[in-house]
Amino acid sequence: IRDRCNIYKHDGRKERGVDTIERKGFNYRLTELQAAVGVAQIKRKDIFVSKKKNNLKMFNSLLEGVDEVVLFKFNPRGDIVPHRNIIFVPDAHDLISYLVDNGVGARTLFMPMHSQPCYDINNDFPITEKIYSSGVCLPSAPSLTQNDIEYICELIKKYFK
């Protein structure tokens, strides 16, 4: 497996410096600049994690009383770092359009695998489709301010009035 991964990592070549491409591959090697940025970000990891957790708490607190919004609940025994701030609403696509029209970078959850063109699976997965049609990813960057989060939550409340 390691050898196969190395082939993929090196543009499909078995060895560096050899121009024979054994199979389709990719260039997964980091540039020095990317590595330097990664090292700098690792040093600030605790700050990023703290901000993302606080942002999620603020979103949940501000949206808790909105009947149409179901908050994504994490296992309380786990210590998660929210990659995304997810809510569920009756019609995600309409809310997302409204938020985007008002300057908020909201998006859908990932399209279900069975709906991806490369898989072409014509089966019915109603739970997956329901989650996709109702899930909204709100901004989650550590750089969000309290004002940003309050603005987003006020827009959501206004949308459902």
Positions of predicted regions on the chain:
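PLP-dependent aminotransferase class I/II
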Residues: I1-K161
